[in-house]
Amino acid sequence: MEQQNKRGLKRKALLGGVLGLGGLAMAGCEVAPPGGVLGDFLRMGWPDGITPEAVAMGNFWSWVWVAAWIIGIIMWGLFLTAIFAWGAKRAEKRGEGEFPKQLQYNVPLELVLTIVPIIIVMVLFFFTVQTQDKVTALDKNPEVTVDVTAYQWNWKFGYSEIDGSLAPGGQDYQGSDPERQAAAEASKKDPSGDNPIHGNSKSDVSYLEFNRIETLGTTDEIPVMVLPVNTPIEFNLASADVAHSFWVPEFLFKRDAYAHPEANKSQRVFQIEEITEEGAFVGRCAEMCGTYHAMMNFELRVVDRDSFAEYISFRDSNPDATNAQALEHIGQAPYATSTSPFVSDRTATRDGENTQSNA
């Protein structure tokens, strides 16, 4: 009888390990998680992703919760079984001793209970790295490269490279502004300044990118970054002052923006395979950066490829035109629709009205 009980315990432990590993194996699958109410529950508040990278992260997140619930149910089941089946009162009713049967020195069981958790962690780590590599890979062959500059407390977006299929004249577009870029490079050194570090200038902006087509956010206007749907895109990030973080919730991903990113050995670039939905999506700074950090928003406006090509052509041909005029030209709302500017004037917010319309 004792030998049978031992075999039963081994089988239960093995079953628990198999179920746990099975759940974790699902975590690395590209299979979409359940939909409906169950799917919403498993997402635990995560928004629906609009890039393949976001979908991969969302799938991984949901299936990890499936694995966690499977393992949790098994462990709580064993825990409650031990409480109610082997409790002192139950043992007393059965006429057994005060202490339940002891299982120490059961080497096979101890090995199972040691090895299975290690394998679970290893499997989870494997699929974590697999998903992370997909998200951070720089192999997307981008057709649009956007320079993103964060500063207290707004954003500047510029187009540095655009594939010929989306650019004016059908030729690859190089958007760097040579004159301003040269001026930025010249700001690097200031031998006559009071900075003691090898004559480096305090106002060095040589690491920032300056483009002919740019969208600059202001206190009164949320910057709208226009991008094409179904197109690989690269983002090149930097900060003009303190640490910021570029975050679009539907990307399920954020990347910090630092001053002098190369000198700080931080990765300033990330790529997405495509954006799968058109529409307006709010973007935010996800790094505490000072007084108005919470109001440092922008909007991602995703349009079809033809509209994006027309948008770029209009801005290239009309350098003095505003971003709002270019958006109107392609039939889009001229100002942000997903978020509003914050009125920073204290005297204007006494009644609690702290947003204003661009209209």
Swiss-Prot record:
Chain positions covered by the region annotation Disordered: 168-203, 335-359
EC numbers, comma separated: 7.1.1.9
Compartmental location: Cell membrane
Binding-site positions, Cu cation A1: 244, 285, 289, 296
InterPro entries reported in the protein's UniProt record: CcO_II, CcO_II-like_C, Copper_CuA, Cupredoxin, Cyt_c_oxidase_su2_TM_dom, Cyt_c_oxidase_su2_TM_sf
Protein topology in the membrane: Multi-pass membrane protein
Function: Subunits I and II form the functional core of the enzyme complex. Electrons originating in cytochrome c are transferred via heme a and Cu(A) to the binuclear center formed by heme a3 and Cu(B).
Record-given protein name: Cytochrome c oxidase subunit 2
